[in-house]
Amino acid sequence: FRALATLAAADQPAIGPAAMAVAERHRQHIEQWFYACPPSLHRGLGELYVQDERFAANIDRYHPGLSAYAREAWQANARRAAGDD
C-alpha cells in the first residue's frame, strides 16, 4: 500500500490512471500468488478494507483515509475493466 499512500499524499485522484495502475498491480499480485481475483472480486476487497475496522486500521497506518482511497481506486479499476469508465 506504500505506492498508493504516495499517490494519496500527493493528492492524486483515486480514480486517476496512476491509482488505477496500482490497483491493477495489486489485483494481479493476488491472482498470481493466491487465488483467482477478477475485477469484481477485487472491488469487493476494497469494500472489505473499509468496512472491517481491522483492515482499515492496518491500511490507514500508511496514510490517513487510505482504505477509502484504495476502495475508490479498486472500484475505478473494476469499472475500467468492465468498460464502464
What is each stretch, according to the model?
Residues 1-85:
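Amphipathic alpha-helical "stalk" segments
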